[in-house]
């Protein structure tokens, strides 16, 4: 049989095998189990087992202990089963360490076990991480139902999405309950009690806390529940009770601060007389397409809100400079940046959190959310902050989708505490505006101090920009209770980033179109070449088998993506059938 008539050539078999391997890899990445801890045999509540390990930091590996803490799943139930949480203690390099620093990550829905900046405090302090229940431990409240609902939506902030989001939470909660999980034992207060259990097990008398964003809520509650064991507390991006949601007025205030910075910048002020007004008017009239590519307006508002939170370039492409640039370009009739944000939101947000843990912690503000949506919060989604709230709470429907924790209403308002506390906020932070801390928390802190950093955004901006100044600010407060912000220099807002969302959009769209067209033309050329001249020679065939599966595979996938983007907006871009057909058909 000649090469021109064989159904499965060697090259085709290899190509199909590669497709199969790629699909297996996609399946593994999607369904592979996470590394988890487990309850040791015979363990009882309060048991802690540790063994030497190395903890990775920005300055290399540090000697540490890693192990497992055993705690009740529901402390209100004497018959509760036990669960396990990971604990890591990074050893101080001093022979006479000060009070240990316990770290509290934000989120919610984010791990508490990763903190590359630990080396900034480990010279004379142990740095301790206690895994968040529902996320880091033996019970992980994954919600693939929520991920799927968000991936298949036609707009992340649409009504249809909100209903699917709430239904998915309900299905996820039912599944975990059927699996024996007591969801009443999860939430912010149980996580705080886990922190205290770790302190006791490690033998520390008093500890320091460094927290950020949603983690600051846990630091507050720890100070209210266990003040005698808390030495000092530093909160970055403060989130007092009632603020797991955003209102339009405060978001507008933050936009006004950006506008003031813009008016002082020649490039920015040359593009708009009033940045805040440009964003407000643009948000009310987001175009539905860039060229032939659809734009999901809710996605744009959601991505823009989170993009405005961080001023550091390290947060790109969700950084304030790139985000604001897309709005100014849209006002100049270039909506390419909006299209890129729309696609980016579809890709990033469905898998951004461990959704069950997210819901269990967010429900600490269930009453505030209920009041907000009862007052009409669903109706004002053109404001970026309101859009973010609508997404996070499913338009208020998540309240009915995830069950309440036993003690979720215990800390719905700020309580006074004498703990020495430093509140740190970025002037331009939209996620946790510093005026929240000034108005709601600081008056209840007789020994509290606040530092608002001009030109800074949310917590990533604090850690990434002027790190020496930030480290001095924290360590000086832990050492003496004094505020030392002397190393800070004026922080400029960059309105001219090296890479813009519009350039990324045009590059990405151009690559998809170019490779897609190349794949189609290549297939047409090869078919015509075989019809006219017969089979390729040995060298030509070898070259095609080696190089063209890459061209045809990528080009075919891009053609598939373009078809999905333009005609099937509810189909996720990581859909396995999409990958199999769009990559497999051109190669096979």
Place the predicted regions along the sequence by residue.
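Catalytic-loop region of hydrolases
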Residues: 2-159, 275-279, 467, 471, ...
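Alpha/beta-hydrolase fold active-site neighborhood
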Residues: 9-15, 21, 26-35, 276-416, ...
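A catalytic-pocket lid/entrance helix-loop region that shapes and gates access to the active site
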Residues: 143, 148-152, 219-282, 304, ...
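Conserved acidic catalytic loop of the alpha/beta-hydrolase fold
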Residues: 177, 189-206
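Short beta-strand/loop motif that positions the catalytic acidic residue
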Residues: 417, 423-425, 429
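Conserved alpha/beta-hydrolase "acid-adjacent" motif
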Residues: 430-436
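Post-His helix in hydrolase/transferase enzymes
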Residues: 436, 461-479
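Histidine-bearing beta->alpha loop at or near hydrolase active sites
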Residues: 454-462
